Amino acid sequence: MIIAVSGKGGVGKTAFTTLLIKALSKKTNSILVVDADPDSNLPETLGVEVEKTVGDIREELKKLVERDEIPAGMTKLDYLRSKIFEILVETKYYDLLVMGRPEGSGCYCSVNNWLRQIIDNLAKDYEFVVIDTEAGLEHLSRRTTQNVDVMIVITDASKRGLGTAKRIKKLANELEVKFKDIYVVANKVKPEYEELIDNYAKELGLNLIGKLPYNKEIAEYDLKGIPLWNLPENNEVYKKVEEIAEKIINKKF
């Protein structure tokens, strides 16, 4: 199952992604995490260090091609494939691939196509693939999120935020991006506003799969730079993310 997590910057997208990965890791360690947001701090929230990104490999290949220094007996595709496996961060709970800098001007279309092909093939070896996408709508307009089973849009607890989720859903339909399901998660919802959020979501035709409360413990972790991966399992928000994961896996929504 391929799950993409989207949302505007600052709504808690990466925090949700981290807790979702933690919840899924209780069921299996066959998880590929793809950090496709160049502005994301997903490795930090997961508590892992990343030495190289896919963007770094792309730039290295461009320089090798310009200098005609591709290793003997290797095609450019072979080189890319070997390097992708080298930079894959393997942990006990999941494997992580960080995309890094976006495709710059003047880079080779064939290289980018090869990269997508390699990553698509790699993804087939995992039970779950979780993609932390770019903030906003860019990944949809460029069609960089492909073959996704579930898109989860994270929004803040406001009518404007839910309106953004509605636009993401509309853009996906216009671009004919195929998702089996699109769900919305409202973040930092005050208890007294839960019913209002439910009504707004219904009014906009959104599948609101969960509402997460503001959480002091998460705010403290963020402030102190503690990886959210270390959040205790009895944390209220983590337990709600576990419930969301169950709904998605078991199609109980």
Curated annotation (Swiss-Prot):
One of its GO terms (molecular function) is ATP binding. ATP binds at G7, K8, G9, G10, V11, G12, K13, T14. Keywords: ATP-binding, Nucleotide-binding. Gene3D superfamilies: P-loop containing nucleotide triphosphate hydrolases (3.40.50.300). The keyword Nucleotide-binding applies. Pfam families: CbiA. InterPro entries: CobQ/CobB/MinD/ParA_Nub-bd_dom (IPR002586), CooC (IPR014433), P-loop_NTPase (IPR027417), ParA/MinD_ATPase (IPR050625). GO terms for cellular component: cytoplasmic side of plasma membrane; cytosol. The keyword Protein biosynthesis does not apply. It comes from the Archaea. To M.jannaschii MJ0084 and MJ0823. This is Uncharacterized ATP-binding protein MJ0685.
